[in-house]
């Protein structure tokens, strides 16, 4: 029973989070470190806890996450997506609440590539009329 878990994969920009939910006491470990150490900003910690707070499961699960790629905000949102999917696998009746909050939707926005002949993705070089 100790090694039974529910799995969820979350993604955001270029970050990918592989999430495992175990029955436990509310401990969250990200890449082998407590999530308070891995994400020191309170806003990122809040983002990670959102699906647990919404479904009133904060103290019910231990969560282990492997996350790679992207920056800290993208990683935090990927973890939130992964936790939401793992919760859904465990309790399908939570779909409505998680869907309304937008935690099950993969945010598909990515950085637009730079085009040749331009300074950036959309910014042009300065035009001189004369």
Swiss-Prot record:
Any one GO molecular function term: RNA binding
Keywords: Ribonucleoprotein, Ribosomal protein
Listed PROSITE patterns: RIBOSOMAL_S9
InterPro entries (alphabetical): Ribosomal_Su5_D2-typ_SF, Ribosomal_uS9, Ribosomal_uS9_bac/plastid, Ribosomal_uS9_CS, Ribsml_uS5_D2-typ_fold_subgr
Pfam families: Ribosomal_S9
Region Disordered, residue ranges: 109-130
SUPFAM superfamilies, per database record: Ribosomal protein S5 domain 2-like
Keyword Ribosomal protein: yes
Any single biological process term in GO: translation
GO CC annotation, single: cytosolic small ribosomal subunit
Keyword Ribonucleoprotein: yes
NCBIfam families, alphabetized: PRK00132.1
Family that this chain belongs to: Belongs to the universal ribosomal protein uS9 family.
Name of the molecule in the record: Small ribosomal subunit protein uS9
